[in-house]
Amino acid sequence: MAPNIRKSHPLLKMINNSLIDLPSPSNISAWWNFGSLLGICLTTQILTGLLLAMHYTADTTLAFSSVAHTCRNVQYGWLIRNLHANGASFFFICIYLHIGRGFYYGSYLHKETWNTGVILLLTLMATAFVGYVLPWGQMSFWGATVITNLFSAIPYIGQTLVEWAWGGFSVDNPTLTRFFALHFLLPFMIAGLTTIHLTFLHESGSNNPLGITSNCDKIPFHPYFTLKDILGFTLMLLPLTTLALFSPNLLGDPENFTPANPLITPPHIKPEWYFLFAYAILRSIPNKLGGVLALAASVLILFLIPFLHKAKQRTMTFRPISQLLFWILVTNLLILTWVGSQPVEHPFIIIGQLASITYFTILLVLFPITEALENKMLNY
C-alpha cells in the first residue's frame, strides 16, 4: 500500500498529529472551543492589522488623520478598522472565558501549559495597550501617559525607566513610533508562544469536564472537533461582524474622536473595558507603588493557582462549595470592571477597595480552605 503523505511527510505529519489524528477526550464540552476561537481571533487581528498598517503613519502629526483617511478613503477601510478594534474585545472575551474554563475544570494542573498561557495573556495585554495608543486620540495619549508613568513608582530606577520607554521627557513622537513597532511585532510573538502552548498541551493531552484520565475513551480530532470548532467560529464571527457593522463605537471611548492634546486632560481617564478590573484594583490603593504592585499581582496571581490547589478532585464539577466561590469570584470581577469605569468618588472608592480585597482573599485564602473542607466532607 502506498504511504499516506499526511502521515509520512515531515511537515504534514506535525499538522496531522496536532489537528487531524489528535486523540481527544470524547466528552469535552463547548467550553473547550475557546482555544481554537483564540486562534481565529489572532489570525483575524494579524490580517486586519497588516492591512491597517499599510495605510497608517506612525507620526504624531499624521497618525490621527491617517486613521481617518483609512476609514474615509480606503476601500472597506472602515470595515477593516472596525473589525480590528472590536476583534480585540472579542479576543479578550475569549481569553477570559478560556482562563475561567481552565480554572473551573482544574486545567491549571498541567503547569507548563497553564504558565505559557499566563505569559500569553500578559503579551496580549501589552499588545492591546500599545495598539490603543496608535490612533493618537485623547484617550490614546492620556492612557499611554498614565499607564507608562506607573513604572516611575519602581524605586531607584523608575524615573529613568519611564524616560527610556518614552524616548524623551513626555509621550511624544518617539513613543508613538516604538509603540507601533511593538504592536507590529508582539502578535507574531503571541503566535510563537501559542505553538509552545500547544506543544505542552499535546504532551499531556486535553483535560475534560470530569477531570479524570480519558485515555480509554479517545476520538480523533477530525471530523468531530473540526466540525464543532467551525460551529464555534460561526457563533463568534457572527456577533463580531454584527458589532463591527451596526455599532462599531459601542465599546470605544468618545474622547478618542478628539486628536491628542497634551494641554487638555480628559475628565475621566480610563482604559478599554477589558482592563477595567485591573485598573479598579490599581485605583483602590491610595499609594502609588502599592497600587502598581496590586495591579501586577491581580494578573500574576494566576501563576500561583496550581500551587494553591488543595482538592483531591481535579474539577469543580462535583464540588458545590467551590462552585459557589467560583461564581462569587466571577461576580466580583464584574463589579471591579464596573467600578473601574466610574469616577473616583464616593461610593465607588469603597466598593472598589472591598472588591479588590475580596478578589485576593477568594483566590489566596478561601479557595484553599474550601478545598480542604470538601476533602474532609468527602472523607478523602
Swiss-Prot record:
What broad taxonomic lineage does this protein's source fall under? Eukaryota, Metazoa, Chordata, Craniata, Vertebrata
Record's protein name: Cytochrome b
Superkingdom of the source species: Eukaryota
Q: What else is known?
A: Heme 1 (or BL or b562) is low-potential and absorbs at about 562 nm, and heme 2 (or BH or b566) is high-potential and absorbs at about 566 nm.
What is the topology of this protein in the membrane according to its UniProt annotation? Multi-pass membrane protein
Known cofactor(s): heme b
Q: State the oligomer form and interacting partners.
A: The cytochrome bc1 complex contains 11 subunits: 3 respiratory subunits (MT-CYB, CYC1 and UQCRFS1), 2 core proteins (UQCRC1 and UQCRC2) and 6 low-molecular weight proteins (UQCRH/QCR6, UQCRB/QCR7, UQCRQ/QCR8, UQCR10/QCR9, UQCR11/QCR10 and a cleavage product of UQCRFS1). This cytochrome bc1 complex then forms a dimer.
Q: Give the transmembrane region(s).
A: 34-54, 78-99, 114-134, 179-199, 227-247, 289-309, 321-341, 348-368
Q: Which organism is it from?
A: Pelecanoides georgicus
Please provide, alphabetically and separated by semicolons, the GO molecular function terms listed in this UniProt record: metal ion binding; ubiquinol-cytochrome-c reductase activity
Query: Which gene specifies this protein's sequence?
Result: MT-CYB
